[in-house]
């Protein structure tokens, strides 16, 4: 039979008729199945049957969907409903005589969501700010058995029922550093297990979040304000505490020109270092600019640099090496706008001309002196100052004067009178002064034996005597007598002392022995006398016979 599609209003009219007009006694219409669960666009066979025995029985099926009558009998008909798009209630009706009756079935349609989509995430999300996640669900039935889940990686953030079409669910996340690189997604769950089917999932596209953090927004630009021509300067720009440092871009510009640099990125630190040779070609004033880019943020720091040229002062000696008594001129000159502010020396002896007392700054200072031995290795110091951009800069120069003079052998150089104990360890110091350094010889005047200069491990009495020391160099010579006295004790004296001590001790022993002998003898005599006296008393007291 040809497929037909019922008119929309007819089922409603039939229901009303069935309610208002009761059927004949015993007549009943039935529909099978009374409930059906099928996918959207599916088909189902519906059987309408009646208990009416009237030969003119009219039996039919009303539905919104395409139907085909597959077969029929006197009181039944079998239909096929196709392309069912949504939940519906097909109606079997009968005309039995002058009455009508009907029965309906429930068809529930299930379908998977047509669209499950997580809204695109921002290119960068700042740490500490709220991120709103949105998941859109279109389609899917039955809605009572449909839910949507938001995920961060494998962690469930939110689970909500889907009660509208389309349905948008949201969830707010406080972004953290740990969310950098995290994957976010959403999926739907259509639970058809109560109907004997499975749990079906539809997953959205996974989106990755990138977070950033800039707790400190001030770049650190480490560089001097003043740059001297002829020097190699290092510029350093850095920022600490940012995240992720590996994604940060940092660069340096000087005078609008990008500098070649070395950059360092660690866990939460980024830096850029550039080395620049300062030349005369550079402008006297330049802008140094550091730029850091992270996410959609840009940080900048600028510094004004001043270029200057400042050469060290020129310090000269009329002669760097002179003889004792010669006159020496010391001169210090500054150039390029610099001023000499100090010309001095390490020696406390003042110069013989023009002095070094404070004076107003000038481009040149000089003085003269008559060289003496005290001026040997005297260091002269010159300081020049240049004011640049309100700051005073200084450069210094030093020179050393060498004075040639003959040997000196004073008490401070060679004590000349030593008294040592025989057998002791001593150090004999005798060092003449002079330039060039003089040689020294010391020998005993009596026999020419040399004086032991330096470490003496054991002093001997044979070293005792007067020595003549001679210091000499190409500048002359000088002599001086020195004395070494060795204290010692004669062995014969010790023998006599020991003998006397032995005699004294022997005499003391003899006297003590004699004293002890006579004392014991006297005690014995005393005891004997006492015994005799006692015996006599006893004899006198005895009665006569």
Curated annotation (Swiss-Prot):
Disulphide-bridged cysteine pairs: 48-92, 52-96, 135-186, 237-290, 332-382, 414-430, 430-469, 442-469
Region ranges (Disordered): 343-365
GO BP: acute inflammatory response to antigenic stimulus; cell adhesion; cell adhesion mediated by integrin; cell-cell adhesion; cellular response to alkaloid; cellular response to amyloid-beta; cellular response to dexamethasone stimulus; cellular response to glucose stimulus
Residue intervals passing through the bilayer: 493-517
Protein name: Intercellular adhesion molecule 1
Subcellular localization: Membrane
Main location: membrane
């Amino acid at each position: 039979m040809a497929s037909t599609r019922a008119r929309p209003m007819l089922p409603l009219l039939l229901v009303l008729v069935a309610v208002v007009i009761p059927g004949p006694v015993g007549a009943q219409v039935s529909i099978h199945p009374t409930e059906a669960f099928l996918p959207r666009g599916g088909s189902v066979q519906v059987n309408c049957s009646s208990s009416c025995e009237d030969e003119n029985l009219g039996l039919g099926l009303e539905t919104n969907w395409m139907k085909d009558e597959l077969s029929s009998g006197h009181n039944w008909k079998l239909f096929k409903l196709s392309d069912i798009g949504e939940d519906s209630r097909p109606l079997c009706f009968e005309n039995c005589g002058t009455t009508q009756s009907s029965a309906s079935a429930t068809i529930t349609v299930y379908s998977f969501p047509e669209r499950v989509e997580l809204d695109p995430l921002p290119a960068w999300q700042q740490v500490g700010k709220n991120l709103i996640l949105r998941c859109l669900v279109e389609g899917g039935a039955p809605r009572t058995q449909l839910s949507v889940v938001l995920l961060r990686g494998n962690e469930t953030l939110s689970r909500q029922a889907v009660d509208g079409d389309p349905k948008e669910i949201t969830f707010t996340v406080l972004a953290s550093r740990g969310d950098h690189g995290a994957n976010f997604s959403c999926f739907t769950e259509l639970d058809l297990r109560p109907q004997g089917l499975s749990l079906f999932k539809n997953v959205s596209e996974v989106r990755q979040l990138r977070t950033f953090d800039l707790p400190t927004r001030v770049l650190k630009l480490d560089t001097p304000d003043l740059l001297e021509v002829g020097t190699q300067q290092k510029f350093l720009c850095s920022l600490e505490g940012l995240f992720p440092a590996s994604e940060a871009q940092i660069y340096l510009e000087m005078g609008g020109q990008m500098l070649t640099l070395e950059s360092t990125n660690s866990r939460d630190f980024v830096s850029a270092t550039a080395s620049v040779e300062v030349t005369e070609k550079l402008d006297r004033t330049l802008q140094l600019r550091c730029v850091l880019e992270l996410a959609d943020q840009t940080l900048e720091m600028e510094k004004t640099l001043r270029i200057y040229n400042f050469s060290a002062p020129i310090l000269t000696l009329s002669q760097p090496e002179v003889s004792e008594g010669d006159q020496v001129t010391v001169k210090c000159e500054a150039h390029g706008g610099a001023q000499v502010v100090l010309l001095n020396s390490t020696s406390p002896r003042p110069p013989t001309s023009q002095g070094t007392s404070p004076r107003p700054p000038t481009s040149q200072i000089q003085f003269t002196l008559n060289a003496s031995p005290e001026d040997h290795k005297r260091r002269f110091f010159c300081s020049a100052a240049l004011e640049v951009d309100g700051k005073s800069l200084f450069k210094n120069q030093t020179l050393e004067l060498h004075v040639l003079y003959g040997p000196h052998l004073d008490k401070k150089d060679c004590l000349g009178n030593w008294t040592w104990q025989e057998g002791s360890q001593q150090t004999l110091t005798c060092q003449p002064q002079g330039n060039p350094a003089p040689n020294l010889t010391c020998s005993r005047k009596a026999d020419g034996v040399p004086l032991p200069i330096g470490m003496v491990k054991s002093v001997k009495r044979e070293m005792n005597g007067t020595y003549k020391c001679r210091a000499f160099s190409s500048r002359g010579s000088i002599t001086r007598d020195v004395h070494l006295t060795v204290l010692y004790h004669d062995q014969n004296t010790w023998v006599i002392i020991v003998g006397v001590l032995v005699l004294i001790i022997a005499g003391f022993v003899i006297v003590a022995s004699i004293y002890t002998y006579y004392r014991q003898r006297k005690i014995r005599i005393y005891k004997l006398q006492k015994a005799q006296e006692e015996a006599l008393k006893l004899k006198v007291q005895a009665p006569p016979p």
